[in-house]
Amino acid sequence: MVVGSSTRRWDVRRRAKHARLEGTRKALGLSGKVIPTNKIGMAIDTLVMPGDRVVLEGNNQKQADFLSRALVNVDSERIHDLHMIMPSVSLPEHMDLFEKGIAKRLDFSYAGSQSLRIAQLLEDGQLEIGAIHTYVELYSRLYVDLIPNVVLVAAYAADREGNLYTGPSTEDTPALLEAAAFHDGVVIAQVNEIVDDPKDLKRVDIPGSWVDYVVKADRPFFIEPLFTRDPRQIKDAHILMAMMALKGIYAPHEVESLNHGIGFNTAAVELLLPTFGEELGIKGKVCRHWCLNPHPTLIPAIESGWVKSVHCFGGELGMEDYIAARPDVFFTGPDGSMRSNRAFCQMAGQYAVDMFVGSTLQMDPLGNSSTVTRVRLAGFGGAPNMGHDPHGRRHPTKAWLEMIPKPDPVARGKKLVVQMVETFQAGPKPTFVETLDAVPVAQKAGLPLAPVMIYGDDVTHVVTEEGIACLYRAESLEERKALVASVAGITDIGMAADPAVVKKLRFEKKLLRPEDLEINPAKANRSLLAAKSIADLVEWSGGLYNPPAKFRSW
């Protein structure tokens, strides 16, 4: 019996990594971990090989933009067919990699501003998509079948031994970096500052033994204030839906732990807590524990004593001083700055919260939703992760247990998954459609599955300006379709609703109109908002919130 092999090498990846590092050391004349700023191009040339799996940190907010500019300037004759793995595809140079033939395949979670270009490159055959993931799913695959050869990340500061301070914008960095650091991949970090004395780092978020090289970028890394919503853009329709949600969902189920999406609907909810929420008498019963980026619109609720804790996926530009001054609420280090962590916060949002509230671009008659349209391949970010019912959950809460429709000793509770949408998008484009655009997009792109963001069987409530459809109480697929149609307004789906069925659903309280909740739509206006402008949010914060220039009107 052959017990082992005397000829097979078991350290191929390690030897390959050492060869790359040695090649870089000789080519650049390095004696340590610091790459001179003006030699980053040479470093990339020696560290990245054709066909490599390359993780490029694109996050929701933080971007390794200096490294992406260096990568896009390589010779495509020498470096090509890269398999890019990016949580967030956010910068033009991310797509330039594919146009120039440097990269070929993409696995990602969210695209945002590059969604139109991804769709075009896909159609032109210049880009292949592996899959559109939720964040945790993508991180997880880095440890299974997408193990990276090279990881390019961003941090605020480093010392000469490679210790990194990632601070408020830690975001995805630990999850991305560890996959390479412990399986013989190369790790390069761009930083805003390199200090000589390790004691000059505010704290160490990533140990230097995980990092192969650091380079001072030509300018501070780009960060997008993605989760800042100007209260001036909140419309009466948003306020009406927020009032219905608070009275018809949050209050009766006593939802204490939750995640909000980034739309104006949820911003309205946050700004109604100190006003309409106080009127309802639900302070201390709802909205106490959050998995949330540090939304400026949550400031009035925090200052009013509604919020006990907030764990954050990432930072938010301008919120740094406010967060540092509220350590009882936010997770902060001994230096005072916040420690975000998207991987941990996504897990918390999956298993530890009772409710997810978000929006979508399209919803079909069964409640399936997607943000992928015929012209935009936006991806989903964390919505599929937080917007589904995790069957592995075992700890009970009132809200979770109340989603059990009928008593059963072995029944499982359910997370509340709420879709808050207007019946029409800007355009006007109907939100409710017979078939999601995701279906033909998948067929055209050769994807084996339509990129559905949230499946209808996970959705417990749909909220529109027409009312609340309590899908968790549907006793059949036909009844679920009837409930969706009952709140679809004057879309084709809504116009096909049977008035007799709608009347029955209202009688059974499976459908709640504003009047059923004793809410007068005429009173749903901006006077109810605790803050009506960015300037009001600054005032609520006691001057600690420092909004980015584009949000200032003074």
Give short role names for the model-derived ranges.
Residues 2-554:
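Conserved alpha/beta enzyme-core scaffold
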